[in-house]
Structures are given as C-alpha cells and as structure tokens.
Amino acid sequence: MVDLTHAKWRPNRYGGSEKKRTLLFDGKIYMVKFPEPPRSKKTSVSYIGNQFSEHIGCQIFQSLQIPAQNTFLAKYCEPVTGKEKIVVVCEDFCQNGNRLLEFSKIGHHDTGSDKTYTTTIEDVYEIIERFDFAVNKFAIKKHFWNMFVVDALLGNPDRHLDNWGLLEDSAGRIKPAPVYDCGSSLSPLSSDERKNLLLQDENLMKIEEYNLCSVYRHQGKRIFYHEILKTPPADLHRSILEIVPRIKFAAPRIDALI
C-alpha cells in the first residue's frame, strides 16, 4: 500500500462533506479523502468507512463497464498525532482541459424557468429535455439509469443532483462524466458486528434490503429500490436488461474485490 505521509501536497481545491486534500502524484492531480468520525450517535463505529466504500464502489462501476474515477487506497500518518489512517486517492478527471458540469448547476442554466429543481425523476428529465447545448440526451438518460441500477446494487442512498454530471472537454464536447462519490455505498456506517448479524439472519437481511431507498422521488413518492425495479419505467427497464447480465458476468470479480 502506498504511503502518503511524505507526499507532495498541493493547496486544497475540493469541497464537500468529507475532509480532503489535493495530491500531486506521478505527475497527476488526485483528491485524497480522509475517514471521518460519524455524525450520528446511532452507530458504534469510531470512523465512517467511506474511503473503502468510495474505492470499492468505483471499482465495481468500472468492472461493469461504466466509466468511473480511478482510485486506490493508501496510508497516511498524521504528523501531529502520529495516528495512521487509510485514505482513498481519487484521480482528478478534470485535467487536460476537462471540466465537470455538476447536474445541479446545469439546472441553474435554465433561466427561462423560475422553477427550483429537486431530486425527482421528473425534474431530472425536464432538465435534460431543456438542454440548449449540443449533447446526446439519450446517452445522458441512459447513463443516469445505468448508474441508478448499480447504485441499487451497492445500496447507495445518496446519489443526488450534486454528485453526478457531465464532462466537457477543451473542444466543448460534452458526455457523461465518470461516476464519482460512491462513499455512501455498501453501508459505511455499519459495524462489523451488524454486518455479521445480517449475514447470519436471512429475515433481517430481507428487511434491510427492503428498506433501501434512493434519494430520488417518482410520481410524488420516495423511491424504494425493490419497488421500482419490479415495475420500472421504460428507460430504467432498458438499463436493467443491459446492466444485470454484466453484474452476473462480473460477480466473481466483484466478490474477489470485496
């Protein structure tokens, strides 16, 4: 495992909820995410396992042939406390003239409407349909639903308008950005004891699965993954038919990764 204790750090350029630093490594810029203490008192874990969720989640997306940010795990020793931490190192894909267009910010582009867009499927579609720049709208919708299917597999409850988007290159060409921000996947707040309990109790596991929901709403109701996957909209159905066979094919590799 790479040791970043004496790495070449740059002034931080990244925001968001977790603590981050900017790293120059092998001639490339990386965002380094650090583990944080949980914000909720309802968990017994001392640190959120979001760095492992980020790395494994992105690796699973890549194994399913969906572009995602390149990541690796590394160790870092705090110079003041001497405490060693495991961090996730995420390659910045906004290099060589590329620029990330967060989906929420694209919604602000629509000055012809006074509407405030929220995390509903209807609003996602409305934003896409109102694009007035050159982009493949079908490809954006397909990317959204492909990402949705894999987020369901990962149990990600926190894919919203701020953590996915489009990538614009130096020539102005626009396409879906690589998937990033998978830190809420794979139950990062669950303790090892809780996970072992779920593995041993089939009924408890089913309850856990049935309570998994997306942050999105559809037709006025919060989306529970198990419900919408049973009766999917047409575009989601197409993504299910495309992604599920990939999941089955990649299952041994995913198991080995986890």
Regions found by a protein language model. Name each.
Residues 1-112:
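Conserved ATP-binding subdomain of kinase catalytic cores across diverse folds
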Residues 102, 117-123, 250-257:
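A diffuse structural propensity rather than consistent per-protein peaks
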Residues 107-129:
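Active-site-proximal helix-loop-helix substrate-binding element of RNase H-like nuclease domains
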Residues 122-191:
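Conserved kinase catalytic-core segment
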Residues 16, 54, 121, 233-237:
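A structural signal for well-ordered alpha-helical scaffolds and beta->alpha junctions
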Residues 57, 61, 113-117, 191, ...:
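Glycine-rich loops and low-complexity Gly/Arg-rich segments
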Residues 169-258:
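C-terminal catalytic region of ATP-dependent kinase domains
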